[in-house]
């Protein structure tokens, strides 16, 4: 009987160890290290796929964006980049023409609209702003606020280091996402928490609250965070005036809930693409609400829209600039598909005598630019 019991114990131990070993092999993807950042700032990307016939690396750091990976005798596909500038980079794999997948050897994954991407950060001047550093950290909350349409909407709110333990009041930046995005967009791909922590710690930005509402009126929250069930994000917009119409309720709720300085000179609004359009429309429709406005690669309607909120553009801009904003900042990349619309909009501002600041970068309609714009814009806020 004792021998039989020992046999069962031995068998259970063997099964447990074998199961654990199998799980470890699965988790470790055959010991593949990917991504591997090298001393010269190049990166090696690897994928264990011994049965694959071809693997294409889709990324923003290889010439042309797509590159065929090379298979080793061990079934590991590999690509080594050239030396990379300090930045955040994204990548995915396409195996034998199938749908793209993230790197199974890396847990660093972000979502942009409905696409999942693996990422890494090359350290240095810019990359260090996008990564956690040894500084005092702020807090990030996801909250629900009741809007003027009677529905609750989800928002992400960043509060600076020391907010919870103090009594001080803070200025507020309302930061808006683009088409297909949600309240998570600026957190994941935009790196807003890391950027604000680091800029504030370096004394380059004033301590401030950052509010990121869900600007897609078709949904009240990011996927998986509402009673709407499982839906797939797509490039649906909210450019019908409804988001702008409810925005005073957003500001009112924030002022009632957080220790804010409820004055226009202590409020800023900015956004990317559709969010830039929203920021432009909200700031002109409520001219006494914001003294700082940032348009990042902003979408600009041409001609009549048929939406009352968007009509009388010249008349409302004149009224807005009668009390000139402390900063009206427009930024766009020279390769952005919205570049011409922004040229036309600046020509209109020039014609009306509206004072603004313009910043032009290289590149197109991409997060790489929008992170830079946020870094630059945040450093100019609440200092006049």
Language model segments and positions:
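Short, solvent-exposed loop/edge segments of extracellular or virion-exposed proteins
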Residues: 27-30
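Non-catalytic cap/lid and distal C-terminal segments of serine-dependent acyl enzymes
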Residues: 25, 37-66, 71-384
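Short beta-strand segments of immunoglobulin-like
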Residues: 32-36
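Bacterial Sec-dependent N-terminal signal peptides
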Residues: 1-24
């Amino acid at each position: 009987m004792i021998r039989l019991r020992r046999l069962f114990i031995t068998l259970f131990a063997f099964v447990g160890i074998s199961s654990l070993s199998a799980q470890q092999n699965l988790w470790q993807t055959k010991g593949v290290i990917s991504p591997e950042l090298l001393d010269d700032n190049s990166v090696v990307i690897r994928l264990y796929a011994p049965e694959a016939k071809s693997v294409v690396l889709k990324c923003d750091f290889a010439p042309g964006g797509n590159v065929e990976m090379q298979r080793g005798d061990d079934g590991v596909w590999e690509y080594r980049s050239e030396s990379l500038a300090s930045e955040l980079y994204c990548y995915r794999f396409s195996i034998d023409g199938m749908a793209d997948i993230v790197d199974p050897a890396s847990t660093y994954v972000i979502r942009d609209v409905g696409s999942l991407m693996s990422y890494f950060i090359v350290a240095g001047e810019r990359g260090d702003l996008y990564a956690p550093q040894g500084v005092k950290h702020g807090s990030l909350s996801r909250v629900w606020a009741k809007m003027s349409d009677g529905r609750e909407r989800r928002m992400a709110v960043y509060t600076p280091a020391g907010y919870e333990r103090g009594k001080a009041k803070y200025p507020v930046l309302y930061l808006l996402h683009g088409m297909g995005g949600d309240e998570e967009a600026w957190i994941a791909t935009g790196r807003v928490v890391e950027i604000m922590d680091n800029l504030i710690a370096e004394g380059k930005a004033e301590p401030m609250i950052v509010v990121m509402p869900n600007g897609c009126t078709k949904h009240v929250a990011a996927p998986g965070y509402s009673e709407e069930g499982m839906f797939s994000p797509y490039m649906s917009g909210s450019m019908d005036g409804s988001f702008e119409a409810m925005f005073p309720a957003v500001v009112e709720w924030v002022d009632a809930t957080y220790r804010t300085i409820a004055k226009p000179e202590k409020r800023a609004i900015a956004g990317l693409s559709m969010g830039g359009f929203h920021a432009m429309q909200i700031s002109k429709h409520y001219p006494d609400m914001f003294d700082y406005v940032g348009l990042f690669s902003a979408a600009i309607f041409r001609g009549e829209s048929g939406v009352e909120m968007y009509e009388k553009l010249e008349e409302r801009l004149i009224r807005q600039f009668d009390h000139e904003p402390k900063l009206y900042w427009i930024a766009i990349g020279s390769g952005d598909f919205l570049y011409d619309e922004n040229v036309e909009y600046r020509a209109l501002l020039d014609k009306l005598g509206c004072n603004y600041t313009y910043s032009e970068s290289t590149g197109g309609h991409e997060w790489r630019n929008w992170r830079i714009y946020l870094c630059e814009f945040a450093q100019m806020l609440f200092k006049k």
